[in-house]
C-alpha cells in the first residue's frame, strides 16, 4: 500500500500560525544565549495516541496463539512508519504498521480491491485483489481522521487469498481493542 502525504501543506500552514516556544532554562554553570533558531520540542502533527503504542506489543502471547502466530515480532520501519513483523516459517507472515499521519481517507487504495467494513468501533477497509489470488490481504483500521493501522498478511506460496483475509481479520480483531 502506498500513502499520500497531503498533510505536509496543512501542517506548514498550522505551524506558521504557532508562536515561538520559550527556551528551557540554562543548566547551572552554562551561559544562556538566545539562538535565532527556536529550541524546544519538535512540533506535534496530531495527537492520535498511536505514538505511545509499540506495534510489537499489540499481539501478546494469548493474541499470537489465537492468530496462529508462534513467534515473537520483529520491529521494523516501513516508509517512515513504525511496524512489527511476525513470520511463521512455512505458513504466513503478518505485519502491523502504525501511521500517525495518514487516516483511511488519505490512503491510496484501488476501489475495486477495497471493501468498507468495521472492526470493533473503528472504521476499516479490507483490501484484497481476489482476481490476482496472490495469498495477500490487508485490513486498514481508521484511528481518528489522521491516523491508521494496517494489518498485512501474506501466505507462504502466495496462494489462498480468502485464508489470508481470515487471518488479517483475526489479527485486526485482536489489535483493535488496544487502539485509541
Task: Report residues per predicted region.
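Positively charged n-region of N-terminal signal peptides that target proteins for export
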Residues: 1-4
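Short, low-complexity, disordered segments immediately C-terminal to signal peptides
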Residues: 7-44
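Sequence contexts marking disulfide-bonded cysteines in secreted/extracellular proteins
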Residues: 19, 55-57, 83-87, 136-138, ...
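Amphipathic alpha-helical segments
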Residues: 53-72
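Extracellular/mature segments of secreted proteins
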Residues: 62-67, 91-95, 145-146, 172-175
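Short, solvent-exposed recognition patches
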Residues: 66-126
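A short, solvent-exposed beta-edge/loop patch
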Residues: 115-180
Amino acid at each position: 500500500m502506498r500513502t499520500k502525504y497531503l498533510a505536509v501543506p496543512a501542517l506548514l500552514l498550522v505551524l506558521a500560525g504557532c508562536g515561538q516556544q520559550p527556551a528551557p532554562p540554562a543548566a547551572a554553570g552554562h551561559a544562556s544565549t538566545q539562538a535565532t533558531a527556536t529550541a524546544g520540542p519538535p512540533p506535534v502533527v496530531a495527537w492520535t495516541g498511536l505514538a505511545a503504542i509499540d506495534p510489537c506489543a499489540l499481539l501478546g502471547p494469548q493474541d499470537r496463539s489465537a492468530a496462529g502466530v508462534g513467534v515473537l515480532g520483529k520491529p521494523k520501519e516501513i516508509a517512515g512508519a513504525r511496524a512489527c513483523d511476525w513470520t511463521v516459517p512455512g505458513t504466513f507472515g503478518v505485519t502491523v504498521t502504525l501511521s500517525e499521519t495518514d487516516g483511511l481517507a488519505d490512503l491510496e487504495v484501488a476501489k475495486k480491491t477495497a471493501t468498507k467494513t468495521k472492526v470493533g468501533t473503528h472504521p476499516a477497509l479490507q483490501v484484497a485483489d481476489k482476481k490476482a489470488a496472490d495469498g495477500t490481504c490487508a485490513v486498514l483500521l481508521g484511528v481518528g481522521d489522521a491516523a491508521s493501522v494496517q494489518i498485512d498478511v501474506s501466505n507462504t506460496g502466495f496462494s489462498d487469498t480468502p485464508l489470508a483475509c481470515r487471518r488479517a481479520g483475526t489479527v485486526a480483531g485482536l489489535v483493535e481493542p488496544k487502539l485509541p
